[in-house]
Amino acid sequence: MSARVSAFELEVLRSAFETIADELAIIVMRTSCSSIVRDAIDYSTAICDARGRTLAQGATTPLHLGSFHDAMRNLLATQGARVAEGDVYIFNDPYLAAGQHLPDIYIVRPIFVSGGLEGWATTVAHQNDIGGIVPGSNSIGSTEIFQEGLRLPLLKLFDGGRENAAIWDILAANVRVPDKVLGDVKAQLAACLVGEREFARLFARWEPERFRAACDEIHDHAERLARAEIADIPDGTWRFENHIDGLGDAPEPIPFRVALTVRGDEIVVDWTGTSPEVRAGINSPVPFTNAASWAAIRSVLSPDIPNAQGFTRPIRVVAPPGTIVNPRPPAACGARGITGFRMMDCLMGALAQALPDRVPADGSGGSTLPTIGGRHEGRPFIFVETIMGAWGGGMQRDGQDAVAHLGANQSNVPVEAIEAEYPISVERYGFVADSGGPGRHRGGLAIEREFRLLADEATLTVRSDKRRFPPHGLAGGRPGSGSLSVLNPGTPGARVLPVLVTEPVAMRRGDVFRHVLASGGGWGDPLDRDPAAVLEDLRLGRVTIEGARRDYGVVAVEAPDGPRLDDAATLALRRALRGAAG
């Protein structure tokens, strides 16, 4: 029988792989034990071919896009002939196993059909804890990976179907909340078992040679589509520079520099000039740097391109060794998420120059990650939250409010779940008026949240961003507002915390932690914003009467039925403001 596969058959098979990958994602969500996986959706799933190449990835975390590429390449290069039916691999180490950071545990299972290796079911999930010097294992202040928790090189959790009970024991002994961690790993294992079953069922419907040829063609097809899209981007080199605020109480800006070069149907992402690696937990191992770079490029290409590994072939990532985007062991990397988000934001800044109609102004940055851990009623608890922010305004519309960063696609933990599961009360959750970056199209609003501790004591760590360097606007739009973290706001003992907290903060019963995320930058001249849109923002409480006048030159007055525009005064004020601006 010919190995040739029709376009129709290829699309059916590709869709089947995507369905299986999404089914794995649903299984992990529905069977996991921790809120960081179940509610915040900090995990990913994928189906790979026999060579470990990603055929489809579940619709969860874009920053994990490609996270299986390096891991599977390393696994097959080092394990190769030792891979056997019934095996399950577990690993997390970025230096020994091409992982991303220690909290992200990979569970992968080879799929054998009729005695031959035909594919892989793969999962990665952020664990609530993996040991180390702070609860939640997201220490900014770590100076080397040995301080960050349990390192798992490539290990067989199951060897030919035989369970390695010692690994479970080691894992349980090294984490603060073993019930959560082991439960989530078992959820990943369950997903892989289902992936194996569904893949085998799909394989049985095909002639083996044609199935393998179709897998190759899925990669080739993704590559062709990506190249066609890249070819439509103007040739040239676009540069962008930005900074993370810095570390601790005396922060020094940490620069990120990217040169995005388009030549024909290929792209080079060059991070030369970016900060050297730092003695802190925000270094990005190169597999994560690759994933962040691919995800940014992928976001401006057609959604019809499959998330198969072939789409990465036209993209070359240059990450100089010894930098924050390619650290040398044993550099710490537990809180590397902020660096991934900043890399994506830098790339979007470069892409905005090449594709101004596709890229919005800068957003709030990655999710703020506060972690509160301690003991309550004799039991340990670790609360990890992903506070989501806003997108910048774009050429066509205002920025989105209260959504995940482009690279996250995650969610906050619902208030009801927090208060039911943890000794924490959510005191405040809402938008901050007048915070969105002014523009013809306004940036999304900042979000504020307050958490009150109900346990006797706990420790707090915070990973946030964009206070000193707030989100930039585009096309004449103004910057968004910066972030803020405060312990016990509005009290005589109020304490403003650093953007990146390097030393755990002690909390006592009744203490309140307040965080305000950065907002989105604006797009276009604020004086060109439709006054009717400003009026709608006034009615919804997104903008105040004072803010409308100050930021948009719109004059409104309060009335019994809500604010009303003063058209004549608005016209006069805008004329005066434009004249003053020259």
Predicted ranges, named:
Residues M1-E85, I90-V113, L117-G582:
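Glycine/proline-enriched, intrinsically flexible loops and inter-domain linkers
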